[in-house]
């Protein structure tokens, strides 16, 4: 699933093509993805100017004066910017034409979403999917003190707390495993048992790993590509994720794989305590 770095890479890729431009048309090639496409979406967007782009966790936000288009890439989605006239393929479900370019959403498994939040409904942060999200890990509110305070009553494993998204947002399965490794924290440790000093290491690791992943175009494991069609390459730098049985890059102990909350977790039993 595309995580925060992949969505931020996508946002930065589409922004120069969208911001300040007028939408000339929308094509929907299915009734919807995870949820139905909004009614009359073509009429809602046609002729309207895109003011800016944003991101909240794993959601791409495209802002207009009269509302915000909310896009989620789901498990297997990606967005490309293409010239006019490029024929759609089987899994190309949404096109938005801007100038002489087309923003095209491809989603083979159809777990993504394209939703509309009208301005009269209030701030987009109050949308049902966004209102309970935690702080952004690359912004100032995200600190070790925040993690420490918010986890005093959390008896769940720290890996599952990171994935929940209500304390810190956008840290998915890949980057949670990698961040916990860099911080030296066993993913099975109950969150409330972790002290402030260890949260200092974890907060720093999350920031550094997410920033590095963005700089390297995200991770391409199966489906994700950037808007220009290029793959990310952060996966070349994984220390533990998807390296079951391979030697730890630090101590040579075999990397272990366990299941937490129906998700695979990867860690080094020697380096992570």
UniProtKB/Swiss-Prot annotation:
Record keyword ATP-binding present: no
Binding site for DNA: 91, 109, 154
Comment on bound cofactor: Binds 1 zinc ion per subunit.
Disulfide feature: none
SMART domains: Fapy_DNA_glyco, H2TH
UniProt-listed CDD domains: EcFpg-like_N (cd08966)
Active site, renumbered: 2-3, 58, 263
Hydrolase is among the record's keywords: yes
EC number(s) from the headed UniProt entry: 3.2.2.23, 4.2.99.18
GO terms, biological process: base-excision repair
SUPFAM superfamilies in UniProt: Glucocorticoid receptor-like (DNA-binding domain), N-terminal domain of MutM-like DNA repair proteins, S13-like H2TH domain
Gene3D superfamilies xrefs: 1.10.8.50, MutM-like, N-terminal
Cofactor(s) recorded in Swiss-Prot or TrEMBL: Zn(2+)
Keyword list, A-Z: DNA damage, DNA repair, DNA-binding, Glycosidase, Hydrolase, Lyase, Metal-binding, Multifunctional enzyme, Zinc, Zinc-finger
GO molecular function: 8-oxo-7,8-dihydroguanine DNA N-glycosylase activity; class I DNA-(apurinic or apyrimidinic site) endonuclease activity; damaged DNA binding; zinc ion binding
Subunit structure: Monomer.
Entry-linked HAMAP family: Fapy_DNA_glycosyl
Function: Involved in base excision repair of DNA damaged by oxidation or by mutagenic agents. Acts as a DNA glycosylase that recognizes and removes damaged bases. Has a preference for oxidized purines, such as 7,8-dihydro-8-oxoguanine (8-oxoG). Has AP (apurinic/apyrimidinic) lyase activity and introduces nicks in the DNA strand. Cleaves the DNA backbone by beta-delta elimination to generate a single-strand break at the site of the removed base with both 3'- and 5'-phosphates.
Protein family per UniProt: Belongs to the FPG family.
Protein name (record): Formamidopyrimidine-DNA glycosylase
Organism expressing this protein natively: Herminiimonas arsenicoxydans
């Amino acid at each position: 699933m595309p995580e925060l770095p992949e969505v931020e890479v996508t946002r930065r890729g589409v922004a120069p093509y969208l911001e300040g431009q007028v939408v000339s048309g929308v094509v929907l090639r299915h009734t919807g993805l995870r949820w139905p496409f909004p009614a009359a979406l073509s009429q809602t967007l046609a002729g309207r100017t895109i003011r800016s782009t944003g991101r909240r966790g794993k959601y791409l936000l495209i802002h207009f004066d009269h509302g915000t288009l909310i896009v989620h890439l789901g498990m297997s989605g990606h967005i490309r910017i293409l010239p006019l006239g490029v024929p759609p393929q089987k899994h190309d479900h949404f096109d938005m034409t801007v100038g002489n370019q087309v923003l095209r959403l491809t989603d083979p498994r159809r777990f993504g979403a394209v939703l509309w939040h009208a301005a009269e409904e209030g701030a987009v942060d109050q949308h049902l999917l966004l209102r309970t999200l935690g702080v952004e890990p690359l912004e100032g509110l995200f600190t070790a003190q925040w993690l420490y305070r918010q986890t005093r009553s959390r008896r769940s494993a720290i890996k599952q707390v990171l994935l929940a998204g209500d304390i810190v947002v956008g840290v998915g399965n890949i980057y949670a495993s990698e961040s916990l490794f860099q911080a030296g924290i066993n993913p099975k440790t109950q969150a409330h048992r972790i002290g402030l000093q260890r949260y200092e290491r974890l907060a720093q690791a999350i920031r550094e790993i997410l920033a590095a992943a963005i700089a390297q175009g995200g991770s391409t494991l199966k489906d994700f590509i950037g808007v220009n069609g290029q793959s990310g390459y952060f996966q070349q730098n994984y220390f533990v994720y998807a390296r079951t049985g391979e030697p730890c890059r630090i101590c040579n102990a075999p990397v272990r794989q366990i299941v937490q909350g129906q998700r695979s977790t990867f860690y080094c039993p020697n380096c992570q305590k």
